[in-house]
Regions:
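Alpha-helical interface subdomain recognition
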Residues: 1-89, 101-106, 113-118, 131-134, ...
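Short Gly/Pro-enriched turn/cap motifs at secondary-structure boundaries
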Residues: 114, 129-132, 156-159, 173-175, ...
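Conserved hydrophobic/aromatic beta-strand scaffold that supports enzyme active sites
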Residues: 122, 138-140, 147, 165-169, ...
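Flexible, small-/acidic-enriched active-site or ligand-binding loops
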Residues: 136, 189-220
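A short core secondary-structure module
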Residues: 147, 151-195
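Short Ser/Thr-interspersed hydrophobic loop/turn segments at strand-loop and sheet-helix junctions
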Residues: 49, 73-77, 170, 186-191, ...
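Short glycine/proline-enriched turns and hinge-like loops at secondary-structure junctions
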Residues: 64-65, 133-135, 159-164, 177-180, ...
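A short, Trp-centered hydrophobic/proline-enriched beta-strand micro-motif
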Residues: 117-125
Length: 379
């Protein structure tokens, strides 16, 4: 087995590392402070072909594989997890299901919008009473003539107040449980669509999270994604892929924090020598490095399996679980290594710690990942 990246993937990493250093890092702290969506950088990522990069070339994408997308998200998240989150949602949760389940007409219309058209995508599943138990959603879509009439609301929607295209899940038959859920492609300009509360969050301040509301929202019949009653299976399969994106984001956060820790501990002198020379510090940093290497192997393995068309549900859950928990542990320990300085905004590590927490929650909590893993072990 060859663990080395291909020449193409190495070039993608180099390109994204340079972009992150030049464009993302200089504004990361300000993005966090102002809670502003990094619009200019997202436009540049569209120009670079990163947004929607796995979309086939015939629809305006780069035709890249899931590993390439994971590498991009990882590199971006080393300096700004918000930017990594925006890309992960667009690529994995909006472009992906349209590519996989869309009709030829839907692909021809929406995929070019989500690539060369610079339209941002989002995924709308979570509701106030339907979080980990996504089957309990109350949003409804009733077929009336040539269109569906959608009513309800979704919460905690990443890209919520900037997105143009949403993959939305709604009940089309309440008597059938999960088999009564259907998926739709909804545009922000459809009559009856509106954006509700903008969430104020612990971290990911540059990632636009909002409630979206459907009040007699008119959705054309041809915007049904897949067939009626298949929405829940579409959502679960899409989340499998999305978890690879969050694993890559988590990995990037941990790697970014570790790099900050190495640099700081080499320069911080206490008791007559750099604190990097103390064995306790060395062991702590060694454990962080070990976790990053293991997390990278899991994440890349899941991405490669997805790209090869293999079953990857368990791999994605393991990658997401391991890297998210490692990111939280690493950033917490890095803040401790920085001491009082780590608690201030003079250094980025407190932001990294705040950003890391959500990775243990969204796209399935750590507890849900353990359920998925054990279920795929035949337990």
């Amino acid at each position: 087995m060859d663990f080395n990246l291909s020449r193409e993937h190495q070039l993608i990493r180099k390109m994204m590392a340079e972009f992150t250093e030049k464009e993302v890092k200089p504004i990361a702290a300000e993005t966090d402070r102002t809670c502003e969506y990094p619009r200019e950088n997202i436009e540049k990522l569209f120009d670079l072909g990163v947004m929607g990069m796995c979309v086939p070339k015939e629809y305006g994408g780069a035709g890249a594989d899931p590993l390439a997308s994971a590498i991009c998200i990882e590199e971006l998240s080393k300096q700004c997890a918000s930017t990594g989150d925006i890309v992960a949602t667009h690529n994995g949760l909006c472009c992906d299901p349209i590519m996989t389940y869309g009709t030829p007409e839907q692909k021809a219309k929406y995929l070019p919008m989500l690539t060369k058209g610079h339209h941002v995508g989002a995924f709308a599943l979570t509701e106030p009473n339907a979080g980990s138990d996504a089957s309990k959603g109350q949003t409804e879509a009733k077929l009336v003539g040539a269109h569906y009439v959608m009513n309800g609301s979704k919460i905690f929607i990443t890209n919520g107040y900037v997105a143009d295209v949403f993959v939305v899940f709604a009940m089309t038959d309440k008597t059938r449980g999960t088999k009564g859920i259907s998926a739709f492609i909804v545009e922000s300009g459809f009559p009856g669509f509106s954006v509700g509360k903008h969430e104020e969050k612990l971290g990911l301040h540059g990632s636009p999270t909002a409630e979206i509301v459907f009040q007699d929202c008119i959705v054309p019949k041809e915007n049904l994604l897949g067939v009626e009653g298949k929405g829940f299976s579409i959502a679960m399969a899409t989340l499998d892929g999305g978890r690879i994106g969050i694993a890559a984001q988590s990995l990037g956060i941990a790697e970014g924090a570790l790099a900050e820790a190495i640099n700081y501990t080499k320069g911080r002198v206490q008791f007559g020598k750099p604190i990097s020379k103390f064995q306790n510090t060395q062991f702590t940093l060694a454990d962080m490095e070990l976790g990053c290497e293991a997390g990278r192997l899991l994440t890349y393995q899941a991405a490669i399996a997805k790209g090869e068309g293999k079953r990857y549900t368990k791999l994605a859950a393991m990658a997401k679980l391991f890297t998210s928990e490692h990111a939280m542990k690493t950033t917490t320990k890095v803040v401790q290594l920085f001491g009082g300085y780590g608690y201030t905004k003079d250094y980025p590590v407190e932001r990294m710690m705040r950003d890391a927490k959500i990775t243990e929650i969204y796209e399935g909590t750590s507890e849900v990942q353990r359920i998925v893993i054990s279920a795929n072990m035949g337990l």
